[in-house]
């Protein structure tokens, strides 16, 4: 079992044998900690055994592995799939994982419970502390925006506060080291906007030092381009409750612990700080997206308005408006909200409005557990309530692509994942007045309950379902979803394509682009880019093309229109290619990820290395980045700098991405591909597992996040494609 830093310094830990992950047919994930007596009669799933490093995990021992002289790509593919199927939860069909990386999620859970006077259960408290301690920077003891970031004020102050609220004393070596780093960076005064908001709610900062978030903007006509109903869904999801908190200037009652914290996180006494002069103070290490002059002027005008012009009528009207919007968010998502950041802010507002014993607040407490995920390092709040739909859609597709899906040993794996996707389709519309588009028929990123349509997830789910429905092997489950339900999904997907004046032919994430991209000049977050409005994303457009072309091949529904929509999407993909042949990826790292999706999309319309200059440029770029050992490796710095940066060593996931791209493009130099395939085979464990190497995902250019299933899914696909193209060997 791995020894972590928390173990070396003697921090308490729970018994990993007593944890059980519960899932249901809608994909909800929640952890329980049992008594030894309960655990004896409740065996863990193989996923739980693997994740928590239980020696009783049924480790596979395939006959042929990398030490066998005749070990083929298909052998490696089959071994990887045989291992991966053990990570599927039998009750739900999902492939659970700890979708972690961001270091600013857990503060909401801990702060809301502290403010509400709710004691976090001891087993959770212990593991929340362990996770934060185990993700501290190994040199200076601070924390960053994400788990592989340098130490920042934002990450360090929030996680320091969490540790103190959870009971770690200020003189504990972990706290002392982190506090030293925080003060060296200038103290909490340099925290970005979201940090200042949480500190103000905890009475550790003053609201006059927080840039405003006026709820009155929701009273403006929707026809105005700046109306917040036109913003990106995550941004408006956060700033609806934040605008309420900003309006009422909520700070929790002072306690002795908070008094201590006030004295620990600043470089000078709290009472001597002029907070109003520090609205724009952000530590240079934190600052990814500086304020525009436009935003600074707007903030100054709003501060003047709030101080001298806001009247009680407007105050009450705007307060009611945003709380009504919070209630629609809770209704549309059964209190999950779009993600944990806005869920925690919504919970705090609900606590203020309705009280700790209210049904609404208690439901939010229940739903907090959906994103609270345990792992070997400890427990953390994930980036969302999971990646259930995304991973299931890929698993089905890639098992088919690899020639595995119809083999008897994978029948249950495919059926279970397919059943989950059938259950995960949205079958209701949002509450009127939610500023939400039609969603019935679509799929989201995680679960049906979460309820937010995502374009590429809808497309990939449709493609996966059609693959199963086309196979006679799975005839017993074909009835679970009708063609008419797929048509509803296609209707939503087509409605998400940008065919107006914004980025013609592209697909964004959750909605069409509804406001000019120039709105980004009002980005207040300081640590993220591209958050104000929807943006066109090449990989979302690629996935949408994959779903539409596959559907178009087998159905006549809206056939001519779909043909046109595919054509204009392909035009956008080509237009998005950079002069060096690359595409910038926004949801995976980075140029390698986007290149894979782009070249697969172009393959679906018949474009290959031989007949397409776009494909040739894309392949030549990827080949130029191959490392000496035959693999590929790209750093998170690529996402931040918008320029390709090699990682320290080649990586399995990115090698698979590059190989998939080259195989779809029919790249003619087989030796290049062979070297990459050899790396995937050699990095595989004898059991079929690939070990974690580096973070795979990213969002908003600056925040890394892990996709643990990627190290199985994409190598399986790459090896399977290679085997079908070049090998006659069968298992």
From Swiss-Prot:
PFTB repeats lie at residues 125-167, 615-661. Optimum temperature is 35 degrees Celsius. InterPro entries: SQ_cyclase_C, SQ_cyclase_N, Squalene_cyclase, Terpene_synthase_CS, Terpenoid_cyclase/PrenylTrfase. Pathway: Terpene metabolism; lanosterol biosynthesis; lanosterol from farnesyl diphosphate: step 3/3. It comes from Saccharomyces cerevisiae (strain ATCC 204508 / S288c). This is Lanosterol synthase ERG7. It is found in: Lipid droplet; Endoplasmic reticulum membrane. GO terms for biological process: ergosterol biosynthetic process; triterpenoid biosynthetic process. The modification N-acetylthreonine is found at residue 2. Present with 2193 molecules/cell in log phase SD medium. SUPFAM superfamilies: Terpenoid cyclases/Protein prenyltransferases. GO terms for cellular component: endoplasmic reticulum membrane; lipid droplet. Its main location: other. The gene is ERG7. Its EC number is 5.4.99.7.
